[in-house]
Amino acid sequence: MFEFDAFHLARLQFAFTVSFHILFPAITIGLASYLVVLEGMWLRTRDNVWRSLYNFWLKIFAVNFGMGVVSGLVMSYQFGTNWSGFSQFAGSITGPLLLYEVLTAFFLEAGFLGVMLFGWNKVPPALHFFTTCMVALGTLVSTFWILASNSWMQTPQGFIIENGHLIPQDWLAIIFNPSFPYRLF
């Protein structure tokens, strides 16, 4: 019979959070690229059908982006509370990978998201298209770093264990580990 001790409850809670969270980035990644296509088609043809489609999907993108951020924060908080032992053991590798995701991707997305959402009639069309492209690029870069971290946890490479902690030795081996290519593509 299954016992609901602290360990199993933590796993159940994390499984729920991860299952809930993954819905939003998956939709956001696809929608960001789709929004680039829609706005590009509007720029090319000036047909307002493309602009209407863009505006419709932009609202859905914004809600998904916000929900992804909120559920992602909850998930990262659970890393520290539910899995603090793993964080202490592997934090020297997983920490920088998540930091790269925040610095290179999330700030890129968040920096341009405001103009993308509210700048349609306030900035020139080419600049607005650029912001949409930057948000889409940010989602792809974010995907890269998260998949690198997840792939490393599945097939760890490029480290040594010293005094009960992982010490990175080869960041290229850590990032481009054996399971990374098929997770990315």
Where in this protein do the model-derived segments appear?
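Polytopic transmembrane helical bundles with strong interfacial aromatic enrichment
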Residues: 1-185
